[in-house]
UniProtKB/Swiss-Prot annotation:
Organism: Bos taurus (Bovine)
Transmembrane segments: none
Molecular functions per Gene Ontology: protein folding chaperone
InterPro entries: Complex1_LYR_dom (IPR008011), Complex1_LYR_LYRM7 (IPR045298), MZM1/LYRM7 (IPR050435)
Keyword Chaperone: yes
Subunit relationships: Interacts with UQCRFS1.
Keywords (A to Z) from UniProt: Chaperone, Mitochondrion, Phosphoprotein
Localisation: Mitochondrion matrix
One GO BP: mitochondrial respiratory chain complex III assembly
Name of this protein: Complex III assembly factor LYRM7
Length: 104
């Protein structure tokens, strides 16, 4: 896949992720849209293949962090937040026992 196609695919992926992560939050959706568009416009004239690959890597990392680390919180009362996790964030919780087992 050519670099132009990779850049376009990353641009679309970032916007899709933005829509999922900040669903029902108009301010966050707009701020993320502006930031994504601004960053792509700033680097629009970049011609170095090495630098473009580096920027693609950074964009991919940002998308991964948004998708796997950001959780929405909704103000319900004074000093109270309701967390709204997405399925991407829910992972299997493996029980952990930190008490040492006794040798017999």
């Amino acid at each position: 896949m050519g670099q132009a196609a990779k850049v376009l695919q990353l641009f679309k992926t970032l916007h899709r992720t933005r829509q999922q992560v900040f669903k029902n939050d108009a301010r966050a959706l707009e701020a993320a849209r502006k930031k994504i568009n601004e960053e792509f416009k700033c680097n629009k004239t970049e011609t170095s293949p090495k630098k473009i690959e580096e920027l693609i890597k950074i964009g991919s990392d940002v998308e991964l962090i948004l998708r796997t680390s950001v959780i929405q919180g909704i103000h319900t009362d004074h000093n109270t937040l309701k967390l709204v996790p997405r399925k991407d964030l829910l992972i299997e919780n493996v029980p952990y026992c930190d008490a040492p087992t006794q040798k017999q």
